[in-house]
């Protein structure tokens, strides 16, 4: 089902040089379309672009079930003299021009048979301006009465902001009701007819009178619809939400039926009413003819008892034939198919239409049902259902994205912590005991002592590595710590001696100088002998 908002709007020019000019168009968003006509955004109409800016939105008509009906309404409003539904009435608007002419055509169009069956809403955005135009129209054409609200036509004065929040923003279901609330009208009256006309079965069908019972019944019906276990009241086949029609007195009436089933019921009731009217008129005609015949015969004195009895007998036979033919005119025969009498009656009635045009009583509570109101309620529920499903889908997607983002944040935080524990950060100064233990073994101490002795004697520390076969750990401080660190870096001779003598705590300055001289002294005899 098409759940878009279809409307036909009326614009008028605010330019003093174009006073009274109007524009009629179709759209699904009249507020956005008005901005296009005024040039605020692109894709405006060529006719409104040439002259007339700025334009003002006077009113719009909504409630169309699909775009084809709305486009037909727009064409009839734009070309009333070519429309078969208005061209016979356009003589009333002779001498009326510009904006009052457009408003007068709207008055006639909303009363046309085709659109009077639909449940439409007239939204008036500029009540003062429209009031002046209607007053001017009434002064020129008094034969056209002003529009009044009916059971199918709704007239409301509304601002553009309120209109957007109710019909265009998707927050509500098109008539101000919340999308996630109960779709029943809790304060609905038990009946729109007087109590004297209401049959007893209507009272018996009102089982849910408290608000708790109404919501409980709504939840139960919703569960049955979701499980495809809610039957149609006319054919007993399961219904599919939200594509079914219901009585206007829901939940006080339990009628829920398929669209085609209720349309057949409307057609059947229309034919029954037509047959009853035709039968009554036939009886009246025959009884009038018979009474006139008897009166004429009694005045002439020529009618005898035998002729009068024979005529009475023929009249009774004709009445019996008519009643028997009417009793045989049920929709379904014993085999469940449409009877031949109904087929011939449907074929012989040219005024029957596919869509019901007359109100019909509810098969359960006798409440008058308007076909346009039923279809409007069906579309409203379809819009609510669609928006509710979109809202649930959006919430699920947002929840899934939030969960995934949280999972990514947790994993990245854990990874950073593990990396921080695995290796130090760049530029961080290493402690002396980071790679070596705090204590040095006995073998390590002996190797360090031998190495120090060789250094003091002027020997190379890298010539003999047997002393460092044991894995030693650097002490936290002192000479041994420096010796271990120097051996790992592979620094030789003079550097070892210099740093060793500088960092030694027990050596004097004289000993340090002697060590340096021994290492740097050049022996010429040894060099020549070599």
From Swiss-Prot:
Q: Which InterPro entries match?
A: GIY-YIG_endonuc, GIY-YIG_endonuc_sf, Slx1, SLX1_endonuclease
Q: How does it assemble?
A: Forms a heterodimer with a member of the SLX4 family.
Instruction: Name it.
Output: Structure-specific endonuclease subunit SLX1 homolog 2
Q: Where are the zinc fingers (SLX1-type)?
A: 232-365
Coiled-coil segments: none
Localization of this protein: Nucleus
Give start-end positions of Basic and acidic residues composition bias.
Answer: 283-298
Q: Which Gene3D superfamilies match?
A: GIY-YIG endonuclease (3.40.1440.10)
Cite the Pfam families for this sequence: GIY-YIG
Residue ranges occupied by any GIY-YIG domain in the UniProt entry: 4-89
Task: Name where it mostly resides.
Answer: nucleus
Give the start-end ranges of region Disordered: 276-306, 410-438, 474-502
Q: What does this protein do?
A: Catalytic subunit of a heterodimeric structure-specific endonuclease that resolves DNA secondary structures generated during DNA repair and recombination. Has endonuclease activity towards branched DNA substrates, introducing single-strand cuts in duplex DNA close to junctions with ss-DNA.
Does the keyword section mention DNA repair?
yes
- Does the keyword tRNA processing feature in the UniProt annotation? no
